[in-house]
Amino acid sequence: MFQNSVKNGVYPAPLQSLWAMVAIITSLHFAGFKMPYSLTDKILTLLPGKTLEWQFTACTIMAIVIWLTVIYTLRYTLKLLLMYKGWMYEQRGKNRQVSLKTKLWLLAVKILSSGGNKPLLYSYQGSLPRLPLPPVEETMKRYLRSVRPLYDDEQYTKVEKLAEEFRNGIATKLQRYLVLKSWWSSNYVSDWWEEYVYLRGRSPLIVNSNFYGIDAILMSPTQSQAARAAMIIHTCLQYRRLIERQELEPILIQGLVPLCSWQYERVFNTTRVPGVETDKIVHYNDTKHIVVYHKGRYFKVYIYHQNRILHPCEIEIQMQMILEDTSAPAPERTAWANARTEFFFKGTNRQSLDAVEKAAFVVALDDIPYEFDENDPSKLDQYGNILLCGKGYDRWFDKSFTLCFSTNGRIGFNAEHSW
């Protein structure tokens, strides 16, 4: 929302501080106090007149300039403070001894972070420091240290020689490129990692990239597939609303050091669209339906009524209707991209594909139970295999995640890795 974007843009200062600044500058002007360099008077000379209205306009402009200057000063000060890593190596525990440097740092961060308003989910994004670029020598040392257990002495000597050739050769040129990229990018590696490690991969997602999550295996809240599906779907929609309204609190280490919240943005309403050479991730801003798969058929299920999320009981009715009512992409990426272009370009196929790709997420109502037995580990292996692969055609592997529900009320999910 626009209001949240403005609040994030001025954090750590509260938005109300603008009106306080306007009141202070206006009061000083009409009280006869001269601003430094007579800036208010200089602004007034650029305006059409010197009436009370134009004087107030000049004061407002001056207040906005000072307010923005203070905000950016606070933000970049906080960014510099968050670059300090010494707190990681301090002692932990009740009788810990914390250095004076870290104590002063903690106090400064706390003062700047508590700016009078509660931070939204993305409030700290503009204050996070850039990912530091390590020198080539340090990178090579860490690489050699990481591979040493994998090689015998003869093989490791060859690797050392190759590393030395790389360090004395093209490494310097590549490092310069990374330095340039780090100047205009907050993270010099994330976009390349996403594209070249994930999106350019041509192997099927089913076992090469996607991962799965499993239910709390020692708990069984209900044996009803429709009821469990309805409750989890409703909970996911509430969680999505928290993200969209930025009401979810950012993660703070020790309640003070913020972590990046950017990845929350693509949890829902996101799909991976195949391409011949590289895929792309598409995120939709507003989606009011989900897609449910059951026994070879896909159902478009609306999850809102008059801008209200459906109650669990209302969703359960729809799930039960689907269960009582008497093909997904898993091929190689280039083949799927060509099929998508050829067969899903227009008409009903295009509309059906849009319904799936623009869904908040996908739900699979499986027609088998997910079983767990402490005395039979193979059942847990089968449970995980079902969530990871299904039958090969009953998961939409390109969606950000697919919720899977069994006939005995257990759940799990299959998630696409690149987002």
What residue ranges belong to the model's regions?
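Long, Pro/Ser/Thr-rich low-complexity/intrinsically disordered regulatory tracts in eukaryotic proteins
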Residues: 1-399, 407-409, 416-418
